[in-house]
Amino acid sequence: MHGYSYEAMRLTAELNNAFHTPEEIREIMGRITGRPIDETFRLFPPFYTDFGKNIRIGRRVFINACCCFQDQGGISIGDGTLIGHRVTLATINHGLPPDRRHVHNIAPIVIGKDVWIGSGTILLPGVHVGDGAVVAAGSVVREDVPPRTIVAG
């Protein structure tokens, strides 16, 4: 696990510390995720991830600047999804009691097709966002979002 984390830090530093064309960004993201990235993908750096290999990105996905993906539990992003500035996708949490705080609770985040995640949103472990849903800017999402709904708060 630590080897992949250090590789993700190295690759995100490469991505974030110089200008890159869209083609170069896709190539670096392919190395971060360990899989090819579709030519319709767009990302505005900087971008941060602590693992990288558990991110799956569909077609026509746009990720805006300053997003943080904690992907050890797995992150899946469906086709046509838009992700705003400073969105955090967190797939790991810690136990609440002091004697359990070093225990990781891991659950995947699944984002459906044609979803819009507003700027500053935080999705917590285990959240599924249904197709066509909108999550308003600044939301903290701890429960599943049904398809074609708008949630805020």
Q: Where does each model-flagged region fall?
A:
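Flexible, glycine/small-residue-enriched loop-and-beta-strand segment within the central core
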Residues: 47-57, 62-128
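Flexible glycine-rich beta->alpha loop in the catalytic core of nucleotide-sugar glycosyltransferases
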Residues: 87, 94, 139-140, 146
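Beta-rich strand-turn-strand
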Residues: 119-134, 138-144
